[in-house]
Amino acid sequence: MRTNPTTSPPGVSTIEEKSTGRIDQIIGPVLDVTFPPGKLPYIYNALVVQSRDTADKQINVTCEVQQLLGNNRVRAVAMSATDGLMRGMEVIDTGAPLSVPVGGATLGRIFNVLGEPVDNLGPVDSSATFPIHRSAPAFIELDTKLSIFETGIKVVDLLAPYRRGGKIGLFGGAGVGKTVLIMELINNIAKAHGGVSVFGGVGERTREGNDLYMEMKESGVINEKNIEESKVALVYGQMNEPPGARMRVGLTALTMAEYFRDVNKQDVLLFIDNIFRFVQAGSEVSALLGRMPSAVGYQPTLSTEMGSLQERIASTKKGSITSIQAVYVPADDLTDPAPATTFAHLDATTVLSRGLASKGIYPAVDPLDSTSTMLQPRIVGNEHYETAQRVKETLQRYKELQDIIAILGLDELSEEDRLTVARARKIERFLSQPFFVAEVFTGSPGKYVALAETIRGFQLILSGELDGLPEQAFYLVGNIDEASTKAITLEEENKSKK
């Protein structure tokens, strides 16, 4: 099999070197193309069909070579709709894989899978481009030091810390605050780490992509007045796109993130929403390419495809890519091959709870369901680990007592249990936090809380030093000193009412 070298030089070969073929067969988004003998393109080469349809409209379809069939024929998958294509149309081999613009020019802009801007803000400076198929970093380039990626969000940093260069699964239904959490992380990485973010919308609703863009403009994550000062690049391949585009849009976003890591030496946050749609698109393409399906109808190459994407997300000695991936679980079946393959790559899971959101506790991260492989004494230190374990134990005990409280009331509990409940309720409220990107909705200024401050705050609650403060004082504050100040303010307000 002729495969394209993954470190192929950027750009497209000269006109003289380009070979042309003709379309033989079209089955949905899959094209069979015949080339002259000895002029076959490599696997993953980009092919371009430029012609006019019967209504004399310009057709411009880019495809990617997937199989060499023999007899000088190749099978390619289209990255856009194949409407208007006919047998016999001319196909040009570009001589290189799909390449997309990278660098600062991508910030604040929306791209499609081909790296073309789709936001009507004019062309993008494409002097720097990278091919979307690239090798994962070599072993000697990897940074093996286990370090925490501080987000400034208390519940995440304390109970399910993110690994620098790790992969995090974000689980949550509609309306529990996934988008706001994503935007806050984008904002915090820019402020605290001087980093940038890339958002890959893979096979999700176009409306949601538009809403996210509008909210980012409103909150200042995308700076309309000075677009270069934006903190994020957006790449969309939504659910109305052909499977080829949905299968490759994740790689386009990852390629843009790799440039910031390798060339600009920055810490990058890569969001993929939704990683399941990447697998789903691969499954559709696999069937169209005539491969025998594997378990539950998925592609036989599921693990390989997932691995080739996930292994490129890593920390190197130059910088890091930390990835947060929304994971859809079909029919809530965690043993389904798609989520099961994803879980193998994750370092942490952040689970958003509808119950907490309904109580008004934001971020609505479930402190007991969210997990992280980083929460070990040798990585985070004994103080952090023991504080996190005691917080979880207190919340777990409160959860167990809730049924008794509902039936018999608080008065029937022992003195020790009543104290546990009081502290758990304070902890629950202290896990909430005002976000910078939510200032426009809440009116309260956002807070970035350093990890040391977070640990100190929870230690004070657990030690009983703050048992005298009302639980409302802990709601939507930053560090623990703000809770003490808020308690004094509340007390003064109550006195003035009397």
Swiss-Prot record:
GO molecular function annotation: ATP binding; ATP hydrolysis activity; proton-transporting ATP synthase activity, rotational mechanism
Gene3D superfamilies, sorted: 2.40.10.170, Bovine Mitochondrial F1-atpase, Atp Synthase Beta Chain, Chain D, domain 3, P-loop containing nucleotide triphosphate hydrolases
Positions with a binding annotation for ATP: 172-179
Top EC group: translocase
InterPro entries, sorted: AAA+_ATPase, ATP-synt_VA_C, ATP_synth_F1_bsu, ATPase_a/bsu_AS, ATPase_alpha/beta_chains, ATPase_F1/V1/A1_a/bsu_N, ATPase_F1/V1/A1_a/bsu_N_sf, ATPase_F1/V1/A1_a/bsu_nucl-bd
PROSITE patterns in alphabetical order: ATPASE_ALPHA_BETA
E.C. number(s) listed in UniProt: 7.1.2.2
Localisation per UniProt entry: Plastid, Chloroplast thylakoid membrane
Function according to Swiss-Prot or TrEMBL: Produces ATP from ADP in the presence of a proton gradient across the membrane. The catalytic sites are hosted primarily by the beta subunits.
Family recorded in the similarity comment: Belongs to the ATPase alpha/beta chains family.
Protein name according to UniProt: ATP synthase subunit beta, chloroplastic
Species the sequence originates in: Aegilops crassa (Persian goatgrass)
